[in-house]
C-alpha cells in the first residue's frame, strides 16, 4: 500500500485499504480497467488485495512463473501472482505464462503433464483450522462468512477435516520475525548503502530489524522452518487442500497508517506461511459484509497442486454467484479444458490385494495414495482366482459379466512410475468401466491367465471370496 504515487483507492469504500504492495494491480482489475494484472506475492500481496477487491488472486507454486526482472522483496520466497475477475481467466493467463527460465535461479521445471487447470474430484478432503484457532480479530461478519464458505465447499463434495493450524501460524511469524528479514535487506543493500533515509519510514524499520543479525540465526531459522514443514506433512497426509479466510478482517487506511507493522502482521495471519512452506494458493471471493466490503477465502495446497486448486476455486466462485470485482458484471459460462493429467493424483481402481485392509494395500499407502471411494464395475466383468492364490484377475466380458466390488485410490502422479514397476504379469493397468457410467484406470488381467482358473464372480468381489474360504475352514 506504500507508494510514491499515493494509495490506490478501494472501489468499495475509499476509506479502507485496498490490500498490500500489489493493490494497484488488484484495483485496476476490480474496476474493469484490465482483464488481468500481475502482482508479486512474498507473504500475501497477491492474495490480500484480491480479497479486498472481490477478485481472484492466484499465487502459483514457487518458481513456476519467472521472477526475472522483478525487484525482489525476499528473492527465495517471491512469486509473480495473477489477479483476474474469474478463476478461469487467472488459469488461462497462468497457462500462457508457465515455463522454465534458466536466467531465474529460483525457476523450477513443471512436472510432465502439468497444466494450469484440473477437474473437480467427486470427493476431496478440505482442512479447516479448529474453531479455537480461527482468528477474525473482532470481525464477527468475517467469521460468519467463513462458516458459510465451509458449507459451500462441503456441498461441492468436500469432506471437511478440522486440523491443527499451529505449525502454519508459527511458520507465518518467520516472515517478519526471523532471518528472512536479512534476505529482504540483501535484496536492496546495494541500492540503499548510505542512503537509508530515502526509504519509506516503515520500510526502513523493517530493514533495520535485521541489523546485527548473527549468521547463526539464519541456520536456526532454517532448522525451525524445516521442523514446522515436517509437522505440516502430517496434516497434508489427511487433506487435499486447506481452506482459510484470506484475511480475518480489513482496516481503514487511517488505522494502518497509525500502526502499520502490527496490523500488517494481522492481515498476513493466513497468508505469510505459504511460500515459506512451498505451497500453492488461490484467493477467491466469498461474500459481502453488511458494510458493503467484500471478504474472501483462500484455498491452499502443496506445491504443484495448482490445477486442483483452480478447479475447486472455479466451482466455488460459480456457486457463490457474486458480481465480478466492482464491475457489477456476472460470471460468464466460461469453460476451461482440464490438463490431460489430473494433477496431482491419478485415480486407480483396485479389485484385489490392493483393497483397503488387504495384503498389498501397504504398497499404495507407501506411495502416498489415498482411498477416494468404494465403487462397483459395470456389469461386464468376470473375476477369477489366479493360480498363485494371492491375487484375482479381472477380465472384461461385455454382456455376460457382473458388477465387481472395487475401490478407487488417488495415487500421486509422481509415484505412478514406481507403482507400475510393482505390477507383475498377468496383471496390468487398463481402463475399467464403472457402474455409474464413468471410466477409470485400473487393474485388468490378460485373458490367457484365467484359462482353467476358478471364476469367483458370483461372490461379487475379492473380499467376499476370501471370507467364504475362511468360513469354510
Model regions and ranges:
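Short glycine/serine-rich loop segments
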Residues: 1-97, 275-298
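Short, surface-exposed loop/helix-turn segments at secondary-structure junctions
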Residues: 8, 107, 174-176, 180, ...
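A short helix-breaking turn/cap at a secondary-structure junction
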Residues: 59-144, 148, 167, 311-339
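Short, well-ordered beta-strand elements
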Residues: 82, 293-305, 309-313, 317
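Short helix-loop capping/hinge segments that flank enzyme active sites or metal/cofactor-binding pockets
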Residues: 120-129, 179-233, 238, 283-293
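Small-aliphatic-rich amphipathic alpha-helix that forms the alpha element of a beta-alpha
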Residues: 231-234, 262-285
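Glycine-aromatic micro-motifs
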Residues: 314-319, 324-473
Amino acid at each position: 500500500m506504500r507508494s510514491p504515487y499515493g494509495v490506490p483507492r478501494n472501489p468499495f469504500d475509499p476509506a479502507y485499504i485496498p490490500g498490500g504492495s500489489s493493490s494497484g494491480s488488484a484495483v485496476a482489475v476490480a474496476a474493469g480497467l484490465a482483464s488481468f494484472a500481475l502482482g508479486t506475492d512474498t507473504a500475501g500481496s497477491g492474495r490480500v488485495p484480491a480479497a479486498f477487491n472481490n477478485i481472484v488472486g492466484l499465487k502459483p507454486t514457487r518458481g513456476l512463473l519467472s521472477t526475472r526482472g522483478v525487484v525482489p522483496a525476499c528473492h527465495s520466497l517471491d512469486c509473480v501472482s495473477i489477479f483476474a475477475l474469474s478463476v478461469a481467466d487467472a488459469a488461462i493467463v497462468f497457462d500462457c505464462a508457465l515455463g522454465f527460465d534458466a536466467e531465474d535461479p529460483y525457476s523450477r521445471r513443471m512436472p510432465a503433464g502439468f497444466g494450469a487447470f484440473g477437474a473437480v474430484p467427486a470427493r476431496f478432503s478440505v482442512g479447516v483450522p479448529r474453531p479455537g484457532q480461527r482468528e477474525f480479530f473482532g470481525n464477527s461478519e468475517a467469521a460468519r462468512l467463513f462458516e458459510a464458505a465451509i458449507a459451500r465447499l462441503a456441498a461441492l463434495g468436500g469432506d471437511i477435516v478440522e486440523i491443527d493450524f499451529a505449525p502454519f501460524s508459527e511458520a507465518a511469524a518467520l516472515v517478519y520475525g526471523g532471518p528472512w528479514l536479512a534476505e529482504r535487506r540483501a535484496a536492496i543493500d546495494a541500492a540503499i548503502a548510505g542512503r537509508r533515509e530515502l526509504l519509506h519510514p516503515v520500510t526502513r524499520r523493517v530493514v533495520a530489524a535485521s541489523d546485527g543479525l548473527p549468521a547463526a540465526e539464519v541456520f536456526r531459522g532454517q532448522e525451525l522452518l524445516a521442523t514446522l514443514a515436517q509437522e505440516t506433512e502430517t496434516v497434508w497426509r489427511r487433506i487435499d487442500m486447506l481452506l482459510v479466510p484470506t484475511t480475518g478482517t480489513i482496516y481503514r487506511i487511517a488505522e494502518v497508517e497509525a500502526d502499520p507493522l502490527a496490523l500488517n502482521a494481522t492481515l498476513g495471519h493466513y497468508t505469510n506461511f505459504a511460500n515459506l512452506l512451498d505451497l500453492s494458493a488461490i484467493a477467491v471471493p466469498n461474500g459481502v459484509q453488511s458494510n458493503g466490503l467484500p471478504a474472501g477465502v483462500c484455498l491452499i495446497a502443496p506445491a504443484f497442486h495448482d490445477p486442483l486448486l483452480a478447479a475447486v476455486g472455479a466451482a466455488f466462485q460459480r456457486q457463490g454467484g457474486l458480481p465480478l470485482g466492482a464491475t457489477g458484471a456476472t460470471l460468464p459460462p466460461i469453460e476451461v479444458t482440464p490438463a490431460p493429467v489430473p494433477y496431482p493424483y491419478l485415480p486407480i481402481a483396485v479389485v484385489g490385494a490392493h483393497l483397503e485392509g488387504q495384503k498389498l494395500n501397504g504398497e499404495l499407502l507407501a506411495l502416498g495414495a489415498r482411498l477416494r471411494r468404494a465403487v462397483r464395475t459395470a456389469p461386464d466383468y468376470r473375476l477369477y482366482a489366479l493360480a498363485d492364490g494371492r491375487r484375482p484377475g479381472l477380465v472384461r466380458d461385455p454382456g455376460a459379466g457382473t458388477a465387481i466390488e472395487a475401490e478407487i485410490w488417488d495415487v500421486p502422479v509422481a509415484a505412478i512410475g514406481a507403482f507400475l514397476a510393482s505390477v507383475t504379469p498377468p496383471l496390468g493397468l487398463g481402463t475399467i468401466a464403472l457402474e455409474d457410467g464413468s471410466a477409470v484406470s485400473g487393474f485388468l488381467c490378460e485373458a490367457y491367465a484365467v484359462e482353467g482358473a476358478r471364476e469367483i464372480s458370483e461372490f461379487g468381489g475379492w473380499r467376499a471370496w476370501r471370507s467364504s474360504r475362511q468360513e469354510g475352514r
